[in-house]
UniProtKB/Swiss-Prot annotation:
Keywords: Amino-acid transport, Cell inner membrane, Cell membrane, Membrane, Symport, Transmembrane, Transmembrane helix, Transport. The gene is sstT. It comes from Ectopseudomonas mendocina (strain ymp). Its main location: membrane. This is Serine/threonine transporter SstT. Disulfide bonds: none annotated. NCBIfam families: PRK13628.1 (NF010151). The lineage of its organism: Bacteria, Pseudomonadati, Pseudomonadota, Gammaproteobacteria, Pseudomonadales. InterPro entries: Na-dicarboxylate_symporter, Na:dicarbo_symporter_sf, Ser_Thr_transp_SstT.
Amino acid sequence: MSQALHPALQLLNRTSLVMQIFIGLLAGIALALIAPQAALSVGFVGNVFVSALKAVAPVLVFILVMSSIANHQHGQQTHIRPILLMYLIGTFSAALVAVVASFAFPSSLVLSSQAAELTPPGGIGEVLKTLLLNIVDNPVNALLRGNFIGILAWAIGLGFAFRHASPGSKQLLGDLANGVTAIVKLVIRLAPLGIFGLVAATLAESGFDALLGYLHLLVVLVGCMLLVALVINPALVYWKLRRNPYPLVLTCLRESGITAFFTRSSAANIPVNLQLCQRLGLHEETYSISIPLGATINMAGAAITITVLTMAAVHTLGIAVDLPTALLLSVLASISACGASGVAGGSLLLIPLACSLFGIPNEVAMQVVAIGFIIGIVQDSAETALNSSTDALFTAAACMAEEQRQA
């Protein structure tokens, strides 16, 4: 059968998906430089890819979690608690890194009179209220809106209910999960084309000229994210596994982080992470819950963004910050980051919440948000890559640690 394939298809089958994505990336950059108008046109391909991922992710999570819980065998254990602990420690550590970096390399902003016309949450209570309302959302509405907290709540509830169903019903759920997984694999195979379109259109439309004025701020932001990805996260993985963490860290960055960087959506990257966990041979009943949960609450990148931009505003306005206040900012940024997925605009719109800690007026804070949108081409991409790859990394570390303990 394979001998009947066209030579181009044979080459495609022999080339790894990561290499295909890299080729798509280079092709997108080349097209944007040579023919910007054509590059704008192929942006449609990238939009289709992201839309396909976003479309399949809610259904995948709903079916997979429900099937995993319904088919759970008595005596089996999931390892969610240690993963949640790593999520919380990782997010708080990221906020601390951002505070230290902001003190060491203070950034200044050029604040204009224009502010983004967006409505930030009124306080941490409103963020928590939004999360609670998301939990009790209508299941159909949750699937339509991509509300993964609501999807998880209903999937877990129905999964426990189906534990008492007939073997045939449980088998049907398992078959549905396999069917959706097959569709996801097909969508992920389109990643090289999607990233080609996204990169070409983004560079043709924005370029990097708009970013040069905020180069120092971007270096601090991306530097913090790299430090967390390559130092803090490996330290947490070593704490769990007691062995060299870097092979696993680099695998997650390569397999999950690259795709997340270009899709700029943790939700869209859920299918990629689930497939990565499957390839790593992890415990399905654990990763089917921890990955979508991580896409909602594991927000190390968001904590860095909130902290660095808030500290930049504080430095620009000449506000003195003592150590206790900086620690309080870390806690506030960590809690706010966990609610970033429940706020339209994500981490950037939670900046006014952190700015309020220093008495910065909302008008000024929204100007900082506007700057965040200007640098979003890099900031949002790096943030999503860190967030999403960390979901897979911590899940893998916890599952492997449990396997070592039982061995």
